[in-house]
Amino acid sequence: MTAGVPQDAVSDAAPRGGPRGLSTKEAVERRSRFGTNEVHEAAPGTGRLVLSQLWGPVPWMLEVALVLEASLRQVPEALILGGLLVLNGILSAHQEGRARAAIALLRQRLEVTARVFRDGAWQSCAAREIVPGDYIHVRMGDIVPADALVANGTLEIDQSMLTGESTSVGRGPGTTIYSGSIVRRGEADASVTATGTSTYFGRTAELVRTARAESHLQELMLRVVQYLLALDAALVIVFVTASLVHGVNLALIAPFVLILLIASVPVAMPATFTIAASIESRRLADRGVLVTGLSAVEDAAGMDLLCADKTGTLTQNRQTVTDVRSLAPGGDSELLALAAAACDPSTQDPIDLAILAAASRTGHPSYPRSAFVPFEPATKRSEARIDHDGQSWRVVLGQPAIIAGLVARPPGTDDWLERRGGEGYRILAVGAGPEGALQWIGLVALADPIRDDAPALLGRLAELGVRVVMVTGDAPPTARSVARSLGLSGPVGERGDVAHASAEYSGFAGVYPEDKFDLVRSLQAQGRIVGMTGDGVNDAPALKQAEVGVAVASATDVAKASAKIVLTRPGLEGIVLAVESGRRVYRRMLTWMLNKISKTIQIVLLLVAFATIGLFVTTPLLILLMIFANDFVSMSVGTDQARISAGPDQWDVRRLIMVGASMAFGWLLVSFAVVIVGAYVIHWPLATLQTVVFLELVFSGQAMLYQVRERGPFWSSRPAPALLIASGVDVLVLGILATFGILMAPVSPIIIVALLAIVAGAAVALDRLKLWAFRTSGIVTATVGGTTTG
């Protein structure tokens, strides 16, 4: 079946390629003719990216306010609102564009590879380089890289990603396999018939999908807005009532009401998160950790339990012969040479390779082999016919119980088996001899050594408050031995314990890939934020179910497509780095959120308090200008230094509100003092007072930002250069506007300097209030390590 494939591509390309494959020259010629094997994804342009930032709950609030301001003919306010929208849209679009570009580069690094027969030899190449006529080899776990006609071998193909049908279909010689389908079982050679946009389903570009899950930050943002709007609504009622009592025209009140509500909208939050997450994503990529979406960085911050595959993550994924018990006349070397005769190097089986490597190190000559039967699940052994000193011998290699069924087990073997088995070794027995006279030759013990860096990295995860649970398909004795070696505490569960799993277990043995999904759900039901590592096709559901799905370095294409994080290096280091990056993003966003909550409460209470006595201490225009100025500075928090918390980070809106309100009340006293002194002691004109209050609110907002960014005294760490520069520019520009009376009544530079001094002194005094609020709320956990800047 060649639907959707140009006829010349089939009739000309496929037959000539045939089993012999193509040469590099032919492949280059066909690539220039048919194009690369990919479907280009249309990337949104800059304009479209900007417009996309103007659609959503936060932009809607501002857009409604803009329309209302315009309808009330408040032109300056409407222009500033429009400027807020456009500025945040452009900045968010710029950062999202950079993030898309970074993720596109990561997708190239995650590029699907294929085995292709070129220039007379099998070789690996990027799937996008395949051309019609290429001869490819696919096996279990692969994503089919192009439409192809099976030449030999049998496959079980999952086309659910293409057709939606979950039932696998069989494919054999003469049948077509389609690009984007998954090989569930078997292996086969096939001739490529179509590539790129000519494939039947045209899905090559989406073989590795970018995760597009919504960030939890969006939910948090809406919850915070709900709290603040509820507070605003109550205060607005007081404000309107008091204003009407003092005979203020309703037309003058309406703009104030709108601005009070706008003050609660976290306009710059999405842009700040994108900046913070993009910085960490790029840092992770430099260390070999690829994230498929920015939300993955945030999710890693809250992970408190990691289900880690034993093989390759905690161990070296390299079977090694560690001990032998030989009864062969030639000793250990003859035993290993006979065992090697029953191994097949072409399968790349790790056990076969370990025995072959051990045999080669002994220097014993290999035995000529006349026949070979590879390992089969039905017989649980492999066999070979060899020439042994001129005699035809049969050699069998398999589990001791299987070989014991073919030949008598010598006395004394059981003790050795029990001891090594209890230590977690994988043991194989070797039988050999003339047909009908097999003898027990000996035993070979193998183990997968623990990675050198595993204990230290497990210790680091423990410092970060992440408990590690080992998951393995090995037998319980092996799992217990490895858990002891790694220092993991707790019992080792078995497959039957998965349904009622808990964090008390140090690991689970005898687990099939299909059980991992149930394990993740069981732990999530107990309120755990779960990370799961995986590498196989059957790991995909568990990787998607886990909050933090991690595809390890050796993962199949399907596992990588299902994970939020993809490691390019073996071991746990990449996971540690992801957790640390997530914690830094959380700290930066916590700083932003606390500053926003505190500032909103301070502004609303200040305006409403004095409005009740008929004094409007600032104007709607100046409030909007203040929001604009504060957003400009607060977005640079995304680049700031951040300490790494010692425990999983979880958002608690009520505690955020509590800390924010505490800080707001402290700074509210400063604002009250400025208004009272200015209005009733110095007797400034109202316009001058409004400018002074505006400047005090802007300066105190910046001071509060520097306070909440540091969990200890605010002078404990140096802010990032971008934050200092943004603050300096903000103060300078607003100082110039105030001095020359642009958009506000002019004030003397002496007053501006005095306000800066007052705010600086208040920041030092109120830092004790901040420390008390953090301590009593419990919102901030202990930290580990130093600060890290973006």
Language-model segments: residues:
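Juxtamembrane coupling segments of multi-pass membrane pumps/enzymes
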Residues: I90-P145, A151-N152, M161-G172, I275-D299, ...
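Cytosolic catalytic regions of ATP/NTP-dependent phosphoryl-transfer enzymes
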Residues: D299-W440, L446, G459-R460, V468, ...
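Transmembrane helix-loop-helix hairpins at the membrane interface
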Residues: T2-A9, T36-V116, W122, Y227, ...
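Actuator/coupling domain of P-type ATPases
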Residues: P19-R20, R30-A42, L87-H94, R98-R109, ...
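Conserved beta-strand/loop elements of the cytosolic catalytic core of P-type E1-E2 ATPases, chiefly
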Residues: L91, A121, T193-G196, V208, ...
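Hydrophobic alpha-helical transmembrane segments
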Residues: I80-E111, R118, R212-L305, L461-L464, ...
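Cytosolic catalytic regions of P-type ion-transporting ATPases
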Residues: S11, I80, E111-L222, R426-A429, ...
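Membrane-embedded transport module
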Residues: F239, S243, A277, T347, ...
